[in-house]
From Swiss-Prot:
The keyword Transcription regulation does not apply. Its main location: membrane. Belongs to the TRAFAC class translation factor GTPase superfamily. Classic translation factor GTPase family. LepA subfamily. InterPro entries: EF-4 (IPR006297), EFG_III/V (IPR035647), EFG_V-like (IPR000640), EFTu-like_2 (IPR004161), G_TR_CS (IPR031157), LepA_C_sf (IPR038363), LepA_CTD (IPR013842), LepA_IV (IPR035654). Keywords: Cell membrane, GTP-binding, Hydrolase, Membrane, Nucleotide-binding, Protein biosynthesis. This is Elongation factor 4. GO terms for cellular component: plasma membrane. The keyword Protein biosynthesis applies. Its EC number is 3.6.5.n1. NCBIfam families: lepA, small_GTP. One of its GO terms (molecular function) is GTP binding.
């Protein structure tokens, strides 16, 4: 155990975490030069293309240090995006130390800050590293000062490196061996194995990535999942190099994988604990929680015949992603589809892209929404994840919206614009700290405001320098209303939105104008209305296409012309009763582009 080092890499998106992992694998000789590809641990194409890590991965490396001792290094690669923060916390719980990797040109960002504080709270040894020092725009001295001022850790013994060129990589590994402590644990105690991640394999079933905190796990053991009490036989176990290697046992302090022929990912959730059935531990390892979706959206197939294919595809994706939620939803406008729950907007985009790319599905996606808490006059409480499910305004006694705690890190010169944006988004300032040229803002902002366009606008007004970290805090009573969209008198449930009453008139008007631009003209007038309850708040008309029925009349009796015009009028009326209006996909996404009124709501 004294020769084991378990560590994670904390870094913001695109600060070079996966490239640094590649250099470690290369230096330790885990893969030959022929087998090496860029971003080895990012197994999905979408991870490589977007330059992000979505699923936690692990690799065991053997390294001969300068003291001539052979060390076992277990690197746990973690996601860097705010949507996957729970996976990060579970990965950190499996480690004794972490590398804090910061880009030499971009400096410290909010997600780095959040994950670093999580590591410090867990008593992990943090080794600061400044990456990308080969860039022309690199300013390592400024970034070193930021690490000390903003994060508050000693950076005098910092390591400078370039993961791209390989400069300084051996120095980092020597620091891991020197500074990160070996694992603590009792090999003779009852088994406690932390589940870091789990995914589905078509041949083996569910594969779980685990860290042995106490005891020893052997092939053939019977293990119990402590939160559910379900028991399984360990059929295979081993570790990654990153190739999958079988072995007979995992010892205390080691990280590896195990297969128990589990066919359902919900049998083994991230953060849970395995123990031996015949010699169970007294309690589970701390920190386990069931992840709840924060953002919901409707997925509907463009072709109704693809409904079963969409159902199968979501089922397969869910095998690898326990945080994905879906249930059948029927829409008057779009037919049968699914209401899906996600950790955040990036998570939603990734799932949609995988459905379209890997399963060749053409989808209509409704605008994302958050979950609301509704208390009715008969004292029942409901959690509403779709605007169309919201009860009538007369039935609601109290409506509460989710509030997110947002930590924003921004250069001082953009502070005014960022504060104005937070006020526009109905934010309440809780804290402000100045660190040299950087400022940390803490705001409580309604989650509905955060998930729509807050991140994009924050990046836009700060020229990409501001960064954001957010987490759900609590539900708060709010004066929000449901705005329905009616087209020719028919309520289109997929276009319904929930917004604050002060913004409702503005958003209703804006939505009507957007739809008027997007809906193609027909042979009859199309009336577009928005309503709160029974009150129409905005209306517009898409004018009909008109055929000139008098073109064949060259003079003659005026009654003949009147007769033709009357006949056309009756036909248009009949067409309006039975005519179907096809709404383009842009109509559903237009809700996202409706900007909100720039005023603070108390």
């Amino acid at each position: 155990m004294k020769k084991i080092r378990n560590f994670a890499i904390i870094a913001h998106i695109d600060h070079g975490k996966s490239t640094l992992s590649d250099r470690f694998i290369q230096l330790c000789g885990a893969l030959s030069s022929r087998e090496m590809v860029n971003q080895v641990l990012d197994s999905m194409d979408i991870e490589r293309e977007r330059g992000i890590t979505i699923k936690a991965q692990s690799v065991r490396l053997n390294y001969k240090a300068l003291d001539s001792q052979l060390y076992q290094l277990n690197l746990i690669d973690t996601p860097g995006h705010v949507d996957f923060s729970y996976e990060v916390s579970r990965s950190l719980a499996a480690c004794e130390g972490a590398l804090l990797v910061v880009d030499a040109s971009q400096g410290v960002e909010a997600q780095t800050l959040a994950n670093c504080y999580t590591a410090i709270e867990m008593n992990l040894t943090v080794v600061p590293v400044i990456n990308k020092i080969d860039l022309a725009s690199a300013d390592p001295n400024r970034v070193l000062q930021e690490i000390e001022d903003i994060i508050g850790i000693d950076a005098t013994d910092i390591v400078f490196c370039s993961a791209k060129t390989g400069l300084g990589i051996s120095n980092i590994i020597e620091r891991i061996v020197r500074d990160i402590p070996p694992p603590k644990g009792d090999p003779t105690a009852p088994l406690q194995a932390l589940i870091i991640d789990s995914w589905f394999d078509n041949y083996f079933g569910l594969v779980s990535l685990v860290r042995i905190q106490n005891g020893t796990l052997r092939k053939g053991d019977k293990v119990t999942v402590m939160s559910t009490g379900q028991s399984y036989n360990v059929e295979r176990l081993g570790f990654f190099t990153p190739k999958k290697i079988d072995q007979e046992e995992l010892k205390c302090g080691e990280v590896g994988w195990l297969v128990c022929s589990i066919k359902n990912i919900f049998g083994v959730l991230v953060g849970d604990t395995f123990t031996l059935t015949y010699q169970p531990a007294q309690q589970a390892l701390p920190g386990f929680k069931k992840v709840k979706p924060q953002v919901y959206a409707g997925f509907f197939p463009v072709n109704a015949n693809d409904y079963q294919s969409l159902n199968d595809a979501l089922g397969k994706l869910r095998l690898n992603d326990a945080s994905l939620f879906y249930e059948i939803e029927q829409s008057n406008a779009l037919g049968f589809g699914f209401r899906c729950g996600f950790l955040g907007l990036l998570h939603m985009e990734i799932i949609q892209e995988r459905l379209e790319r890997e399963y060749n599905l053409n989808l209509i996606t409704t605008a994302p929404t958050v979950i609301y808490e509704v208390i009715t006059h008969d004292k029942n409480t409901y959690f509403i994840d779709s605007p169309s499910k919201l009860p009538s305004i007369h039935e609601i006694k109290e409506l509460r919206e989710p509030i997110a705690k947002c930590t924003i890190l921004v250069p001082h010169k953009y502070l005014g614009k960022v504060i104005n944006l937070c006020i526009e988004k109905r934010g309440v300032q809780k804290d402000i700290f100045y660190h040299g040229k950087m400022v940390t803002l803490t705001y409580e902002i309604p989650m509905a405001e955060v998930v729509i366009d807050f991140f994009d606008r924050l990046k836009s007004i700060s020229r990409g320098y501001a960064s954001l970290d957010y987490e759900f805090q609590f539900f708060q009573t709010s004066n929000v209303v449901r705005v329905d969209v009616l087209i020719n008198g028919d309520r289109i449930d997929a276009l319904t939105i929930i917004t604050h009453r002060v913004n409702a008139l503005y958003r209703g008007r804006e939505l009507v104008d957007r739809l008027q631009e997007l809906i193609p003209r027909q042979q009859f007038d199309i009336a577009i209305q928005t309503a709160i309850g029974n009150n129409i708040i905005a209306r517009s008309t898409v004018k009909q296409l008109r055929k000139n029925v008098l073109a064949k009349c060259y003079g003659g009796d005026v009654s003949r012309k009147k007769k033709l015009l009357q006949k056309q009028k009756q036909g248009k009326k009949r067409m309006k009763l039975i005519g179907k209006i096809e709404l383009p996909q842009e109509a559903f996404m237009s809700i996202l582009n409706v900007k909100k009124k720039s005023n603070k709501v108390c």
